[in-house]
Amino acid sequence: HCRNRETFLKFDRKIFFCHIPKTAGTSLRLSLEQAVGDAAVVPSQALISHHGGRYPPLHEALQELQEKPDYRLFRGHYGFWVRRYLPTDTLTIAVLREPVERILSHIRHFLADGRITEADAFESLDQGRLPIPDNTMCRYLGGTPIKAEGQELSDRFLAYRFDPIDDHDSLFKRAVSTGRSVDIMGFTDEMPDLYEKISQETGLPLTMRQDNPSRYPELSLSDRQLDTVRRHNQLDLQLYEAM
């Protein structure tokens, strides 16, 4: 680990981990936090605790960035475009997951949180609707900067997850080109490779972990319900293929 430590001491770029929900990102996030040390992370654990264990609204996270200029790691469920608030040489990391698996995990997350009931979820799918945001990976990578500040910025970013996509083609193209610009892109089913890449690049001693597994049992969907999931996530399916 000594050699790694020396590399990290020389590695003076900040790190932005764009944490797309339900991509096994929590395990990576905790490994990164452990490696850089809690004091060097934004949003801070205190701010996250203040929000009941969730990432804080975007404007509060950005406010903390201003207050902690010596941070090493910025991470959260924030769109990739947020990197415009970070130094230009920031090392960027993102993780993609097979889209149908990611959606099922996301639905289970909403069920575990009590945000929807299983009856509602299945009824939505039976009616051809998705009970959670669609094409989340494309939205995170291909979303455009929101020109607002303070609470309005956070509100609009949250609303954007559910807003109808007005131009599928341009969102997809932006997501692909952004995806290709990410310094270190990982995949949920190849996590050891990702840890290896990050360690080599940064010298951080990362430890593989298994965190935040779903607190809700596996879902068993009918073919028709799975078709609904696929139909509503065409962009993410294409993005995953393209990467």
Descriptions of predicted regions:
Residues 19, 96-97:
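Short beta-strand/turn micro-motifs composed of small residues
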Residues 49-95, 101-207:
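PAPS-dependent sulfotransferase catalytic domain
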Residues 2-70, 75-80, 106, 112-114, 189, ...:
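PAPS-dependent sulfotransferase catalytic core
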Residues 42-49, 103, 208-218:
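A generic structural motif
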Residues 16-20, 91, 182-190, 224-231:
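Conserved aromatic-histidine-acidic binding/catalytic patches
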Residues 24, 98, 186, 198, ...:
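A residue-level signal for conserved active-site and pocket-lining positions in enzyme catalytic cores
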